[in-house]
């Protein structure tokens, strides 16, 4: 039996689960359990080899790996949240915080590239934070080496998340380092604006096509970015042969400007000041009027190699007053009916699927458990944007009558 006591599931995907765990001495960690039938041993060993070799203050710490009857397991240090969940939809991060996290992101990626490793799935959802608020880059399931037998090699397998993938990745032959730079550039746009500039960097995408035509960032959300930062975004999203290395990005005047949150080592100087810049989440009225099919299988697409971590953008817990489980489930269904959200009951869960304000699929489940002083509803995001999920949960909570003193809404931290 492994020395780790597996606890609640924080996230699950098609090939693996991430579970909270306790190590000897009651140290907190997470264990990614990969089903053997779904992932070849060589892929697991590659991820372990890469992650084990990394030592950087802005990269989530590798702890251990093992194999048991349940699957291949990777043990990592426990994060305290997710950068993606701190980003306000349509508003982004506070400018000081956006610069702080971008500096730390580029530092981590520069370290990776210095070891001839490219990440291939850089996005805010793969950026955790530690207890001091520092960024921790995570998810190395798609990572690979780009220097082999003394020669730089071009990569050919598409990997990553569509919105953050460089155009050449869709074409089938690309430089892994420069593809990471592109993903960092798109992440910077999200940091600054709270919105994605396009759905995918291909000619058929109207917003991307407009960006390529203008090269001036005249469309939303790019139009809201300052000139100096926008100049950097444009350089990072230039054609592959004109795109700078991450080391060059690190020397950019916008990146190098002083930041009161950073100490001499590039870590957070004042955690209280940092967390004061994170806006408290408030409810936002949304209309979910065009439900999708409940749990319809999405079209095949490159996605994150690991299940999405259940950070504060993935799980919402709603604590309500005295009620039976049956009544609580009925109230959930009635609330979803009122929101015109497609749903179905599966045992003690309600599965739901709808479209958000960006016309993208948002789906998940609502579970109910009985507590000593009432019921707890756990709303879990399966697919969709973290910020849209937060808005959805606020509207659902209000529909459940949870805007009074009897209800408490908490977003999970991992």
Swiss-Prot record:
DNA-binding recorded as keyword: no
Binding annotation for ATP: 10-18, 32
Please state where this protein is localized: Nucleus
Predominant place of localization? nucleus
Instruction: Give the enzyme class.
Output: transferase
What are the start and end residues of every segment in region (Disordered)?
A: 291-310
One GO biological process this protein is involved in is:
intracellular signal transduction
Per the record, what are the reactions this protein catalyses? L-seryl-[protein] + ATP = O-phospho-L-seryl-[protein] + ADP + H(+); L-threonyl-[protein] + ATP = O-phospho-L-threonyl-[protein] + ADP + H(+)
What GO molecular function annotation could you give as one example from this UniProt entry?
Answer: ATP binding
| Alphabetized PROSITE patterns for the sequence | PROTEIN_KINASE_DOM, PROTEIN_KINASE_ST
Q: Residue limits of the Protein kinase domain?
A: 4-255
GO cellular component assignments: cytoplasm; nucleus
Q: What's the EC number here? A: 2.7.11.1
Record function comment: Serine/threonine-protein kinase which is required for checkpoint-mediated cell cycle arrest and activation of DNA repair in response to the presence of DNA damage or unreplicated DNA. May also negatively regulate cell cycle progression during unperturbed cell cycles.
- Matching PANTHER family: KP78A-RELATED, MAP/MICROTUBULE AFFINITY-REGULATING KINASE
Name of the protein: Probable serine/threonine-protein kinase CHK1 homolog
Which species does this protein come from? Encephalitozoon cuniculi (strain GB-M1)
């Amino acid at each position: 039996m492994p020395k780790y006591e597996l606890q609640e599931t924080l996230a699950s995907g098609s090939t693996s689960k991430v579970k909270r765990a306790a190590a000897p001495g009651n140290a907190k960690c997470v264990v990614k359990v990969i089903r053997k039938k779904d992932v070849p041993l060589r892929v697991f060993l590659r991820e372990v080899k890469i992650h084990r070799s990394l030592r950087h203050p802005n990269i989530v710490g590798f702890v251990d790996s093992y194999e048991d009857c349940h699957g291949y397991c990777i043990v990592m240090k426990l994060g305290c949240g997710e950068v993606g969940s701190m980003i306000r939809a349509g508003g982004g991060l506070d400018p000081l915080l956006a610069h702080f996290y971008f500096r730390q992101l580029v530092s981590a990626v520069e370290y990776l590239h210095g070891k001839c490793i490219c990440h291939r799935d850089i996005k805010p959802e793969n950026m955790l934070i530690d207890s001091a608020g520092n960024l921790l880059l995570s998810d190395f399931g798609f990572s690979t080496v780009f220097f082999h037998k003394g020669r730089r090699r071009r990569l050919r397998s598409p990997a990553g998340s569509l919105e953050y993938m460089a155009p050449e990745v869709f074409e089938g032959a690309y430089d892994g380092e420069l593809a990471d730079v592109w993903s960092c550039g798109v992440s910077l746009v999200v940091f600054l604006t709270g919105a994605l500039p396009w759905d995918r960097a291909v000619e058929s995408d109207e917003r991307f096509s407009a960006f390529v035509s203008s090269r001036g960032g005249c469309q939303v959300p790019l139009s809201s970015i300052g000139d100096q930062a926008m100049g950097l975004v444009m350089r990072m999203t230039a054609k592959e042969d004109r795109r700078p290395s991450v080391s060059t990005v690190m020397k950019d005047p916008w990146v190098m400007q002083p930041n009161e949150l950073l100490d001499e080592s590039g870590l957070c100087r004042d955690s209280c000041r940092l967390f004061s810049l994170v806006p408290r989440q408030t409810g936002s009225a949304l209309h979910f009027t065009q439900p999708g099919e409940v749990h319809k299988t999405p079209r095949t697409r490159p996605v994150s190699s690991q299940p999405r971590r259940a950070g504060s953008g993935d799980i919402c817990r709603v604590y309500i007053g005295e009620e039976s489980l049956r009544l609580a489930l009925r109230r959930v269904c009635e609330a979803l009916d009122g929101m015109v959200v497609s749903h179905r009951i599966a045992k003690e869960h309600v599965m739901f699927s709808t479209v958000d304000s960006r016309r993208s699929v948002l789906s998940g489940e609502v579970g109910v458990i009985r507590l000593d002083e009432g019921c707890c509803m756990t709303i879990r995001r399966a697919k969709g944007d973290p910020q849209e999920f937060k808005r959805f949960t606020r509207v659902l909570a209000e529909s459940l009558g949870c805007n009074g003193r009897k209800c408490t809404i908490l977003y999970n931290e991992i």
